[in-house]
C-alpha cells in the first residue's frame, strides 16, 4: 500500500484523518510540524508542548510512527514576515493561505518524500477533490479539481485557493466527505476523548492567549503616529500606527476627540501619509465595496477559467465564514475587476478573493489590490 505522511497537529481533525488512513490500509506516518518558536509565543491557547504530546499519543494509540519537524525558519521567512509587511502597510492578510502554499503543501511534502519516502501527504482540511478523499479515483491524464467539503460550515477550500496541481495531486483529504459532528463522534468512538474535547484553534495561533492582536503587532512593528480624519478632511483624532487598524473595524474611543452614538469605523487607510479615514456608523456606504481589483490571480487548474467560462457563472468570497456570492469579473491586463452581486462590507486590500463555480469547485483566487468604487 502507498505510504502516507499525515500532518499531526494535536487536534481532532488530524487524529481522525490518521485513523481513517490506517483503517483503509495505508502505510501511515504521523509528522508534527513546529512552525513557531515558543520563545516568541509566550502563554498560548495552542501551546506547542501540549499539541505535540497529544499528536504523539494519538499516533501511539494507532500504532503508527511519530516524528516532529522544525519549520520555524521557513514559516518566519515565507509567512510571518509577509504578514507583518502587509499590516505595516495597512493591508489585511490571511497567513493561513500562505502557510498552506509554502509550508504544508511545499516544504512539508519535500520532507515527507525525501526523508520518509512518502507517496502522498494528508491533512485534516475539510475539502475534497475529483480524485477522491483518498486519491482512489486518480488518473494521471486528468486534472485534479478542488471542491468544497461536505460540511459547509467547516469548508476550508478558501485557505487552499493557491495550492497548485502538483501539490494537490500528492495530497489526501480524509475528512472531505464528513461533517464535523461525524469527526467528533469517530474520535470519541476510537478513544480520542482528549483531542475531541479540545477547543478548536481559532484565528492566528502564534499570537498567544495573553495578548490582544494590536498588542502583538506592536511587538514587531514600530509605532508611526498619524491622523484620524473624516472624508471631508476634518480631524477627529490621532493614532499610533496604521497596523492597529483594518477596514470596517470600529475605532476605539481612546483615539478620538469626537463622539458619536453610532461609533466611528475605518473606511480607508492611507499607508503613504499614515492617515485613517473614518465614517460614522457600522453600515455607512463607505464601508461597502461594489467593485475591486484582483492582481495576478492563481488558478488551481492549468487554464484561466475566465477564458472558458462565462463570467456570470462565478461566485466569490472574501471571508471564509461568509458563503460565496455571485459576481461578474472582467479581465484588465494582469488584473481582474470583480463586481459582486451584493456590495461587500469591509473589503480591504491584501484580503484574498476566492472564486468558485456553481458546482462548488474552488477555482483559485488572488489578492485584492484596491477598491475601485463603493456604493
From Swiss-Prot:
Name of the gene encoding the protein in the UniProt record: mttu-1
NCBIfam families in alphabetical order: PRK00143.1 (NF001138), trmU (TIGR00420)
Region ranges (Interaction with target base in tRNA): 94-96
Entries under Pfam families matching the protein: tRNA_Me_trans (PF03054), tRNA_Me_trans_C (PF20258), tRNA_Me_trans_M (PF20259)
Residues flagged as site, Interaction with tRNA: 125, 250, 351
GO cellular component, as recorded: mitochondrion
EC number of the protein: 2.8.1.14
Chain residues that bind ATP: 7-14, 33, 124
Purpose: Catalyzes the 2-thiolation of uridine at the wobble position (U34) of mitochondrial tRNA(Lys), tRNA(Glu) and tRNA(Gln). Required for the formation of 5-taurinomethyl-2-thiouridine (tm5s2U) of mitochondrial tRNA(Lys), tRNA(Glu), and tRNA(Gln) at the wobble position. ATP is required to activate the C2 atom of the wobble base.
GO molecular function, one term: tRNA-5-taurinomethyluridine 2-sulfurtransferase
Name by which UniProt lists this protein: Probable mitochondrial tRNA-specific 2-thiouridylase 1
Record-annotated active site: 99 (nucleophile), 205 (cysteine persulfide intermediate)
Gene Ontology BP annotations: tRNA wobble position uridine thiolation
Further information: During the reaction, ATP is used to activate the C2 atom of U34 by adenylation. After this, the persulfide sulfur on the catalytic cysteine is transferred to the C2 atom of the wobble base (U34) of mitochondrial tRNA(Lys), tRNA(Glu) and tRNA(Gln). The reaction probably involves hydrogen sulfide that is generated from the persulfide intermediate and that acts as a nucleophile towards the activated C2 atom on U34. Subsequently, a transient disulfide bond is formed between the two active site cysteine residues.
Amino acid at each position: 500500500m502507498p505510504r502516507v505522511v499525515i500532518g499531526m497537529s494535536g487536534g481532532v481533525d488530524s487524529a481522525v484523518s490518521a485513523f481513517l488512513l490506517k483503517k483503509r490500509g495505508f502505510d501511515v506516518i504521523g509528522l508534527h510540524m513546529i512552525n513557531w518558536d515558543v520563545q516568541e509565543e509566550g502563554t498560548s491557547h495552542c501551546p506547542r508542548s501540549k499539541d505535540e504530546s497529544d499528536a504523539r499519543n494519538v499516533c501511539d494509540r494507532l500504532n503508527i510512527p511519530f516524528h516532529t519537524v522544525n519549520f520555524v525558519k521557513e514559516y518566519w521567512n515565507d509567512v510571518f514576515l509577509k504578514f507583518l509587511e502587509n499590516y505595516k502597510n495597512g493591508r489585511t492578510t490571511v497567513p493561513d493561505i500562505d502557510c498552506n502554499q509554502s509550508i504544508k503543501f511545499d516544504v512539508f511534502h519535500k520532507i515527507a518524500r525525501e526523508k520518509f519516502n512518502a507517496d502522498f501527504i494528508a491533512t485534516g482540511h475539510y475539502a475534497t477533490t475529483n480524485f477522491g478523499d483518498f486519491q482512489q479515483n486518480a488518473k494521471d491524464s486528468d486534472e485534479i479539481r478542488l471542491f468544497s467539503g461536505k460540511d459547509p460550515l467547516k469548508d476550508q477550500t478558501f485557505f487552499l485557493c493557491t495550492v497548485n496541481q502538483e501539490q494537490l495531486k500528492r495530497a489526501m483529504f480524509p475528512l472531505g466527505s464528513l461533517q464535523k459532528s461525524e469527526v467528533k463522534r469517530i474520535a470519541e468512538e476510537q478513544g480520542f476523548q482528549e483531542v475531541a474535547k479540545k477547543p478548536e484553534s481559532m484565528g492566528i495561533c502564534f499570537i498567544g492567549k495573553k495578548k490582544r492582536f494590536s498588542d502583538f503587532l506592536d511587538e514587531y512593528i514600530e509605532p508611526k503616529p498619524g491622523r484620524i480624519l473624516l472624508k471631508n478632511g476634518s480631524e477627529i483624532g490621532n493614532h499610533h500606527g496604521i497596523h492597529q487598524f483594518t477596514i470596517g473595524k470600529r475605532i476605539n474611543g481612546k483615539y478620538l476627540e469626537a463622539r458619536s452614538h453610532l461609533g466611528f469605523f475605518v473606511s480607508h487607510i492611507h499607508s503613504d501619509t499614515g492617515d485613517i479615514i473614518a465614517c460614522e456608523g457600522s453600515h455607512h456606504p463607505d464601508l461597502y465595496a461594489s467593485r475591486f481589483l484582483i492582481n495576478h490571480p492563481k488558478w488551481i487548474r492549468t487554464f484561466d477559467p475566465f477564458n472558458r467560462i462565462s463570467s456570470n457563472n462565478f461566485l466569490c468570497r472574501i471571508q471564509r465564514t461568509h458563503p460565496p456570492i455571485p459576481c461578474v469579473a472582467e479581465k484588465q491586463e494582469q488584473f481582474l475587476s470583480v463586481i459582486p452581486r451584493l456590495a461587500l462590507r469591509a473589503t480591504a486590500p491584501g484580503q484574498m478573493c476566492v472564486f468558485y463555480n456553481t458546482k462548488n469547485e474552488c477555482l483559485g483566487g488572488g489578492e485584492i489590490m484596491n477598491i475601485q468604487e463603493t456604493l
